[in-house]
Amino acid sequence: MSRTESREHAIQILFQIENEAHEISVEDATRFIVEPPNRDVFADELVHGVISKQNELDDKITPHLKSWALERLNKIDRIILRLSAFELLYTDAPEKVIVNEAVNLAKKFSDDESYKFINGVLSEIIKNKA
């Protein structure tokens, strides 16, 4: 399974978790996206990383939203930003790859203009990362 597919799975799993009116476990959400007995280890790492670091990620994202509140963003954009910020801050994946993947995820799962916004926010996070 490619990392691109894994990122898509992670986005879908995180969306499922955030979209449920009742509590749903990561395992149950994953079963909706990745059919057992298959397993997507990279998606699992991303999902657990985003969930465990969510408050820190939100703190890193929020200053770059320019007159927006994180909770006012549509869910998929918020999830793409969290996932990408997690990769930027806590993995050794190349920054250009992460931003490119985020832009592609936004083009695939969000509205027509979201990718520009996401690209801008991630660029600011990179500038202020050090």
Curated annotation (Swiss-Prot):
Where is it found, in Gene Ontology cellular component terms? cytosol
Please, which domain of life does this record's source organism belong to? Bacteria
Give UniProt keywords alphabetically.
Answer: RNA-binding, Transcription, Transcription antitermination, Transcription regulation
Q: Does the keyword Protein biosynthesis apply?
A: no
**Can the keyword RNA-binding be found in this entry's annotation?**
yes
Question: What GO biological process, any one, is recorded here?
Answer: DNA-templated transcription termination
One GO MF term on file is: RNA binding
Q: Which family does it belong to?
A: Belongs to the NusB family.
Designated name of the protein: Transcription antitermination protein NusB
| Organism of derivation | Macrococcus caseolyticus (strain JCSC5402) (Macrococcoides caseolyticum)
